[in-house]
Amino acid sequence: MKRLCRWSPLVLAAAVFCAAPAEAACTATFTADDAGTFPETLRFDRETKRLTVDLSGLPAGATVFRAELILQAAEPHRQVPTEPTTVYPVGAPDERLAFAGPLDRGLACLEPVRKALAAGEPLRLVVETTLAGVARLEVSYLEGRPRRRLPKVTGVAVRHRAGQTFVTFREPPLADVPEFGTGADVAAFRASLAEAHPDLRFRVWRSAKPITAETIAAARLVGECGPLTCWNDTYHQNKTKKEPPVRYRVRDLADPLPWGTGVWVHNPEAAGRAHYAVTAAVAGEEDFDALAPAAVAGPVTETVGPGEPVLQWVEHPDRWMYRRGPLTRLIYTRWEAPPRSSTPSSPIDYLVAMGDDPPPEGEMREPQYRAYRVEPAPVGLHLHCWGGSLNGGYGWWYNAHRGAVLIASNQIPYDWWTGYHARRGTRRTWGDGGVHPYTMDRLFAFLDWAMTQHARAPEAVRKHWRRLDPRRVFVAGSSMGGSGAPMFAVRRGRRVAWALGWVGVHVPAESPQFRSSYRHCYGPVDAPVTMAGRDVSPWDWFSDVWWLRHHAAEETGLVIASNGKNDGGIGWPQALAFARALQETRRPHMFNWDIQGHGTHTRVGANFEIDVRTDRSLPAFTRCSLDDDPGTATPRPKEEIEAERERLRAEAKREGKNPNHVKVDPFDGEPRGAFNAHLAWETETIVDTPDRWEMTVVLQDAAPADRCTVDLTPRRLQRLRTPKGRRFTYTVTRPDGGKSLAEGEATADAHGLVTLEQIPLLKGRNRVIIAAAK
């Protein structure tokens, strides 16, 4: 156990009211209760919705440089208003107070406070709508000192890296720090600190000039955090309590930050030189007299940018995620900030895994279990399920045998890999701002950065990186990840070549069990919440069915998906609606269903052999004569289900099987089946010119018939021009001058899509040629 000096909460609370020297400065608080610098000075009349704050405790002529009305945090399960936060000076409804950064936990009211002080009157505000009420008023001013002794921060250091400034500091020694064995130990220690020292926060100030008590008025508050920010309490996700604790590194492969070190990462809005200071605030009170040299740092030269991930550590397992090595795992942390997060300095971990050996020249045993190095390498974004983490829960390491580099991250928050409202981590309401695709954006931002690392990675790991192929990006996942993967391919079809998802939610509003999970991220279904900058509800925007039907001409990646008809939590009707939308909007897809519940996998396993790329055309197969019938998602009568269950149980008993394992389809249609299960195509011989398109389509040997008919729509065209109304001729033949199977004409529709209806295909290879009509 490390022995650290303590500061006592008794001393902390002791009144030390002193005359303020000219250079003194502090943050005082005005409260409704008996706490704070000026207790019982804040009053709210619920009938008139008027808030009055008695400012007479401030010295005459005080130089006020910050005033913030801190809003109350909402209790768990409290209903969040859907109206925007509305607070304004009495008689001035057009002067609504705006949120004050960095965490949007309060409203900026500097000018109203200055006006009230100049007039010698109380601050009077109308409070129409807030998250959960008002907690206190904070006023930072010169010529003042706090009424109690506050702790001091030391060891402040700053370092800038690629658009982000890392501010580290030594937290005040609060207690003896024990030896931590697990994350549960750290969590218990943090809880004890919060109980002994409630509402302790560390604030980061930034200025263009050195920061002292005399110059603090020129500084801006840019950061605020609680204790123990050196602890990475999200790396292991739901296993955090059982695993040894992980501490952050703020330099590539450096030592972890010592316990008791705080960290805040700031993205400056403008380039230049800056100075920083860190204060300790207790219930909002600050003492800027405490800005000794150890509490300030700078100058540091800053640039504007998103920042770069920091390499935390490297692993070299021989086996991992059902693949054999040698392998390399690189673990990074990126402190996310808007526009990739609703709040600044939000650390999220990322994993990059790759095989280190090149593939053998000849045949070898079980190559599907190996992970190889190829260049340029395909890249797979792997999205974990509920309860998973970047270390697993996404099915497989897909296409590692083809050299695919795995990228995974932790899902924070649980937004099903889509996005969430700007209010997360703040004290905004659903009416303040909108929903952003933060999660999608941050993953693609990490991918963009990863594309550069073959040339820019630290020397110690650069040999493991290889050029990544932006044309061969795919997304894969299971359950929650199986919901996100198709959403990526549907909305980011120009970047995602293909996606594979098991048992996903495709229409969030129609998931029987998980609709509430989405509601925490999007707001109520019937609320007037929209996507940021768009006049559309997030419940529509993140519905794959809505998106496909409202963006018929936009290209999507190949979607490979599966759902269980008896998966009551995810929901079969919404899954079938997705499959129908894929068919009816003519998208490249393979979809299968079964009655294996939440364990229904795609027919494509860990290795997908078709070389799908974003710079190559794709075929959309629909209405294939070999497709099975999924039904209409109409529930079967209960008596019919029970009769079938009893029949299957009796059969199981006769065969010596467990009768409790029988499964019955609760809906109409075939209990198991697929769309496009027996069709494939060759990628190397595609012809795509302004006036001609050719592809070899394969009816696979495992097909249940020697012949089929199918509609074929070329998608993701690279050069073929298909304006509305343009006429085309087509032929279907056996390759290499083989017999003709069909010929005809087709016309581009209103969306610029050309569909060859019910063309015949024979088992094996079939050449389809489309040419502009003369």
Regions found by a protein language model. Give the residues of each.
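Alpha/beta-hydrolase active-site loop
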Residues: 430-465
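The feature captures the conserved acid-bearing segment of alpha/beta-hydrolase catalytic domains
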Residues: 506-618
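Pro/Thr/Ser/Gly-rich low-complexity, intrinsically disordered linker/stalk tracts
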Residues: 145-196, 285-313
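A domain-start/cap signature at the N-terminus of enzymes
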Residues: 282-378, 741-742, 751
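Recognizes extended acidic, P/S/T-rich segments that occur
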Residues: 179-272, 284
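Flexible, small-residue-rich N-terminal segments that precede or flank a structured functional core
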Residues: 24-58, 75-76, 84, 89-95, ...
